[in-house]
Swiss-Prot record:
Residues involved in [2Fe-2S] cluster binding: C70, C76, C79, C111
Stretches assigned to the 2Fe-2S ferredoxin-type domain: 33-127
Leading EC class: translocase
Spans through the membrane: 4-24
GO cellular component: plasma membrane
Cofactors, names only: [2Fe-2S] cluster; FAD
Keywords linked to the UniProt accession: 2Fe-2S, Cell inner membrane, Cell membrane, FAD, Flavoprotein, Ion transport, Iron, Iron-sulfur, Membrane, Metal-binding, NAD, Sodium, Sodium transport, Translocase, Transmembrane, Transmembrane helix, Transport, Ubiquinone
Substrates-to-products reaction catalysed: a ubiquinone + n Na(+)(in) + NADH + H(+) = a ubiquinol + n Na(+)(out) + NAD(+)
Full protein name: Na(+)-translocating NADH-quinone reductase subunit F
Function noted in UniProt: NQR complex catalyzes the reduction of ubiquinone-1 to ubiquinol by two successive reactions, coupled with the transport of Na(+) ions from the cytoplasm to the periplasm. The first step is catalyzed by NqrF, which accepts electrons from NADH and reduces ubiquinone-1 to ubisemiquinone by a one-electron transfer pathway.
Family: Belongs to the NqrF family.
Note accompanying the cofactor annotation: Binds 1 [2Fe-2S] cluster.
Organism field: Shewanella denitrificans (strain OS217 / ATCC BAA-1090 / DSM 15013)
Length: 408
């Protein structure tokens, strides 16, 4: 009997020791209680929060919206903050976006920083002007086979003080979207049916945030206008996931409510007299339209400028009347379209081929000084890479190549 008692006692003692070890480790490794996040050395900006969560989310919960085009996934590298103390060691996931020198200076991706202890951070003052709005959908119309123009109404008495080339972030709740419910006009449905896209569904169990560039310019007041390309899986493997945000946006109808935050941006025009060359493709049309309308309508710029847009066929061209009007009203502006796959019904007599080749063969090859021009581009990744390679071969420096890189 004594042996039984001794055995039970030893087992109980071991369990108690293990519990004490776990509690001690937890006290050292897991933060508890209130945490203070000091911001810019300003006591009025400090945040008191509980332990846990990512710094990006904690800041957003307290009305401070740091840019994150990927919605906190660690892939865009935009949600940078400078951490003066606290925050722990930089993670391998951050090193693709932050150099060793930047890391030594305290640069971190806020979406990767766990809030576990008091910290001091520095933010750009512009961040404190970023706000959140609940907007009404005015319209959501196809402009091309796979591109919709989403037009949002800003609440009465409010404005989004953005600059041309800027962007907003849009929020999508958890959702289940059936592509069969999309409003796709008859002239675009052929490709959708051919590829089997109407069979697709998008099921998302958590909130999603993504960034989109404005297609409107600052003096188109009271609205936000976006060009959104649907992100489908490749036709040969429709079992792959659909684009979370684009599926949600394509499901929106007039009168629906949408939450956005902003404005953000870095893709701004330089204040010089240099010639401006704009190159776009697909939904990369959005910042091109914003920039050109801003330059020619608001600023009344006399700088020489041209716009080169690549599309697959005539059916994929949009805002044609807008740019024809700008060209008619401004002798310093021309625009050109190249079709990579014109159809017989297009009766197309304009440029054909890929836009980087067309731009080179028909303009830059004989240009006196292409290295003195400023090049603004936004389009599919392959287009961007081809244009940049061509410009480098012409001797254009990095400082004159400006890219809105959201993957087209």
């Amino acid at each position: 009997m004594l042996e039984v008692y001794l055995g039970v006692g030893m087992f109980t003692a071991i369990v108690l020791v293990l519990v004490l070890v776990i509690l001690f480790a937890k006290s050292k490794l897991v933060a508890s209680g209130d945490i203070i996040i000091g911001i810019n050395g300003d006591a009025d900006k400090a945040i008191t929060t509980g332990a846990g969560g990512k710094l990006l989310s904690v800041l957003a919960d307290n009305g401070i919206f740091v840019s994150s085009a990927c919605g906190g996934g660690g892939s865009c590298g935009q949600c940078r903050v400078n951490i003066k103390s606290g925050g722990g060691d930089i993670l391998p996931t951050e090193l693709d976006h932050i150099s060793k020198g930047e890391a030594r200076g305290g640069c971190r991706l806020s979406c990767q920083v766990n809030v576990k202890s008091d910290m001091e951070i520095e933010l750009d003052e512009e961040i404190f002007g970023i706000k959140k709005w609940e907007c009404d959908v005015i319209s959501n119309d196809n402009k091309a086979t796979f591109i919709k123009e989403l037009k949002l109404q800003i609440p009465d008495g409010e404005s989004v003080p953005f600059r041309a080339g800027g962007y907003i972030q849009i929020e999508a709740p958890a959702h289940h979207v059936k592509y069969a419910d999309f409003d796709v006009p008859a002239k675009y449905r052929g490709d959708w049916e051919h590829f089997g896209f109407f069979k697709l569904e998008s099921k998302v169990d958590e909130e999603t945030i993504r960034a989109y560039s404005m297609a409107n310019y600052p003096e188109e007041f009271g609205i936000i206008m976006l060009n959104v390309r649907i992100a489908t899986p490749p036709p040969r493997n429709l079992s792959l996931p659909c684009g979370k945000m684009s599926s949600y946006i394509w499901s929106l109808k007039a009168g629906d409510k949408v939450t956005i935050s902003g404005p953000f941006g870095e893709f701004f025009a330089k204040d010089t007299d240099a010639e401006m060359v704009f190159i776009g493709g697909g939904a990369g049309m959005a910042p091109m339209r914003s920039h050109l309308f801003d330059q020619l309508k608001r600023l009344k710029s006399k700088r020489k400028m041209s716009f080169w847009y690549g599309a697959r066929s005539k059916r994929e061209m949009f805002y044609v009347e807008d740019f024809d009007g700008l060209a008619a009203e401004n002798e310093n502006f021309q625009w050109h379209v190249a079709l990579s796959d014109p159809q017989a019904e297009d009766e197309w007599t304009g440029y054909t081929g890929f836009i980087h080749n067309v731009l080179y063969e028909n303009y830059l090859r004989d240009h006196d000084a292409p290295e003195d021009c400023e090049f603004y581009m936004c389009g599919p990744p392959m287009m961007n890479a081809a244009v940049i390679s061509m410009l480098k071969d012409l001797g254009v420096e990095d400082e004159n190549i400006l890219l809105d890189d959201f993957g087209g």
